[in-house]
From Swiss-Prot:
Keywords: Acetylation, Chromosome, Cytoplasm, Disease variant, Hydroxylation, Intellectual disability, Membrane, Nucleus, Phosphoprotein, Telomere, Ubl conjugation. The record marks D490, S491, D492 as: Interaction with PIH1D1. Belongs to the TEL2 family. It comes from Homo sapiens (Human). The lineage of its organism: Eukaryota, Metazoa, Chordata, Craniata, Vertebrata. Residues 444-472, 627-651 are annotated as: Disordered. This is Telomere length regulation protein TEL2 homolog. GO terms for molecular function: Hsp90 protein binding; molecular adaptor activity; protein kinase binding; protein-containing complex binding; telomeric DNA binding.
Amino acid sequence: MEPAPSEVRLAVREAIHALSSSEDGGHIFCTLESLKRYLGEMEPPALPREKEEFASAHFSPVLRCLASRLSPAWLELLPHGRLEELWASFFLEGPADQAFLVLMETIEGAAGPSFRLMKMARLLARFLREGRLAVLMEAQCRQQTQPGFILLRETLLGKVVALPDHLGNRLQQENLAEFFPQNYFRLLGEEVVRVLQAVVDSLQGGLDSSVSFVSQVLGKACVHGRQQEILGVLVPRLAALTQGSYLHQRVCWRLVEQVPDRAMEAVLTGLVEAALGPEVLSRLLGNLVVKNKKAQFVMTQKLLFLQSRLTTPMLQSLLGHLAMDSQRRPLLLQVLKELLETWGSSSAIRHTPLPQQRHVSKAVLICLAQLGEPELRDSRDELLASMMAGVKCRLDSSLPPVRRLGMIVAEVVSARIHPEGPPLKFQYEEDELSLELLALASPQPAGDGASEAGTSLVPATAEPPAETPAEIVDGGVPQAQLAGSDSDLDSDDEFVPYDMSGDRELKSSKAPAYVRDCVEALTTSEDIERWEAALRALEGLVYRSPTATREVSVELAKVLLHLEEKTCVVGFAGLRQRALVAVTVTDPAPVADYLTSQFYALNYSLRQRMDILDVLTLAAQELSRPGCLGRTPQPGSPSPNTPCLPEAAVSQPGSAVASDWRVVVEERIRSKTQRLSKGGPRQGPAGSPSRFNSVAGHFFFPLLQRFDRPLVTFDLLGEDQLVLGRLAHTLGALMCLAVNTTVAVAMGKALLEFVWALRFHIDAYVRQGLLSAVSSVLLSLPAARLLEDLMDELLEARSWLADVAEKDPDEDCRTLALRALLLLQRLKNRLLPPASP
């Protein structure tokens, strides 16, 4: 026979029947009050055994019955909201876990927008505001052995963390502010603090507690990407609580230790980002990094080598945490070894984005600042070997930021690891990053805070000067003796200073007046002043005497290409380059043929080869400039055939064209005259053919002929990748300058073949040049010619560009690939308009 139903079961069954069928408000009110006996709210209270039976077996059915009866008419059975308040008290005063689950079940089961849905949602918001979520988690922290407890915990875990998603899906436009993720997870963080405080109180009272459920809630919330909201509230509160309580520290350590492995990375990353300083991080984590392998991997590998999201203060907190305990310091030394090994790896330098390389460099310097000389001494040889390998690879890089990182880190590492040896010194441009890195390498002592610095500076700035200028005149003569001498001291103030801004240094050697004289002075003269005067006058003479220049153009280009600085001449490189550009512009084809032939010749330095590329680019730009041919010469110009002068040439003393005084006066009148209107539209500059049209092939094609043939001293596909990158950029620039020329299509086809042969180059600077070259082709050729002559090449390039835009480690390469893809898409849209529906 089945056992007889208990008194509680019979009472609950009768109450549910009455609540389901009765329409009498007084009867319903009395029934609910009778049930509240089992919650300990009414007199006479039920027995503890009856309360436990009601809470474990009958509370959820009662709540479901109350939720099913919810309607406007049912709540109005009693006036003044008495029935509604009594109805809500069952959800707010009984077991929090069951009330929460019934609330969520009713909300998720509601069929569309309704009165019941909104009423239950508002009741859930009140449930959260009154701290019932903390009560729910406190109940899960007690050691429980009831059947189904694990299943209940998993259900609660999913509902608690995913509450904003569930409510957002059900309420949509009617969602309440309490359920917004940014608000809910902050509230959840505050409730976690309350639960941890309750756990501490229980431990102080001698009761056992567990924080595993809270750890799972924290881990799942962080995995969902809500670290900032929940830890932004949790970490400052815990930092304050753990500062003076070792028991709070132990509870925090246990909280993080019991986070599931799948959520450990998200939680630790959020803690490192939220903790202000290594002291706070150490109080929250303890020696977790030593005990937990997953935590050790995250803290010493993933955050340092595989990510670059941590800022400099976060890196200092993380590595400072490793340095603050004797059990963790061996990990810090091991981290430094692995960081330097990665920093010095040629493969990592080629395939790692620049932000990640900066991240690793900062971590290396912070580690060095945290470790002492005795700890570094035992690993000196290993660290020096990694550092020297890294310096070599970084100085060979084509990217200036990579080279600068190598110089800065090498200086600091060598000084710290081998202080008694000769220091490494490099010359590099100081910028914000270099100053930050050097500051990381030499941190201030613990006592040198900002406040101390501020107090030391205040007296210096507030203290009046010990002596005034009047007191130190004439060797300290008293001011009373100088009272009558003020007029004598100031008597020269009425004189106007002589203007010496136009003065020029007197030269004993006169500047040459002919191009041949300049060639002779540059090649044979031992007079330094005459040599310098010839160099400064050469550009202007070339532009003013094109006929004489063409007679010796190749010889002059050869002289300038091999010219070395005999003495310290201000702007020597610029003078030499502008003179070479002037010669190339004046006689383009022969000089371009000579320069391109010398680019692949023996016995030239990399600097000379890059100078050739720069000169070709600048000369092509000058030749393609509109109005460069047939331009009216300035009055006073000695030759009617003078080409357009570059601005730099006009600014030089030796190449300035004398201006007629009438021109000066007319220009002043024009600048001072205000005209309200003019009769006709202003005409644009007169059009003229591009001089680059006929010589573009001389500049372009010879540079492509031998790039894959190594020489004894020059290998573009080997170590000289810097020049290869400059060559790719130069070819792209020449392609842009050849727009609308007859040879542009052939140039574009050859350039795409060059790009295709090198598309998988390991150097980022070379890839940047290749991607720029592709964009140059797309911008320079007419759309019809691209589709007619280069369709196959463009189809091949499209898939490569998409792959680069998605996977290339260099950010600039990804950006250039995206621009090229946009140009291709624009070309497609222009030629193939969308079909009408």
